[in-house]
Amino acid sequence: MKTTILLVILGLTLLFALSAATELKDEERDCKGFQVKCKKDSECCSSYVCGSQWKWCVYPSPFGR
């Protein structure tokens, strides 16, 4: 009986953690991912920049702009 209650509480905690992680992921969907057309850096997700030549969201150059 005690084990069953403990497993139910553990399951509910796991569901709560997964739903919170899903909500955080939804907030980031407004940004554009890798090789998607962009006009400025703010449109791209945090790990990308808007490339100056082709205007795609790409990884930033290690050598600067």
Curated annotation (Swiss-Prot):
Its main location: secreted. It is found in: Secreted. Transmembrane segments: none annotated. Residues 22-29 form a propeptide. Pfam families: Toxin_12 (PF07740). The presence of a 'disulfide through disulfide knot' structurally defines this protein as a knottin. PROSITE patterns: HWTX_1. This is U11-theraphotoxin-Cg1a. Keywords: Disulfide bond, Ion channel impairing toxin, Knottin, Secreted, Signal, Toxin. SUPFAM superfamilies: omega toxin-like. Disulfide bonds join C31-C45, C38-C50, C44-C57. The keyword Secreted applies. GO terms for cellular component: extracellular region. Belongs to the neurotoxin 10 (Hwtx-1) family. 32 (Jztx-16) subfamily. Residues 1-21 form the signal peptide. GO terms for molecular function: ion channel inhibitor activity; toxin activity. Probable ion channel inhibitor. Expressed by the venom gland. The lineage of its organism: Eukaryota, Metazoa, Ecdysozoa, Arthropoda, Chelicerata.
